[in-house]
Amino acid sequence: MTETAVQPQGLLRRAMDSMQLPKSRTKCFFLFLLSVFFTYAGFHHLFVPDFYVSIMPPWVPWHLELVYLSGVFEVMGGVGVLIPRFRAMAGTGLVALLIAVYPANLHMAFNPHLFPDIPLTALYVRLALQFLAFYWAYTV
């Protein structure tokens, strides 16, 4: 009687198949990149909140609490896009999150004197890149 050894690459293949990843390597790459980007950003909000608190418009209440909340949602969305059952919901949630944080980006662009360490061009480019991020999250 021969014993069948479990092949690690077989386990990995089954795990990857269960994730129902896109067939295109390019789409798969961008899905993982989206996940890493938002998961990293979320943990950054949670562990280094001072910068994010500083960019919030003064009219928004509960600065620290909302920074933590956005960090949690970023991590959830970043992980969620990798789980087929939650992928569409996570993408929609990330779009909602991006819309919710857009006022902070506008605040920075309209008040560059408050952020002298960040070049004005970067503040405006960030506004434009946000629309690319909307599309990216929406199309998962």
Predicted segments with their positions:
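Membrane-interface extramembranous regions
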Residues: T2-V140
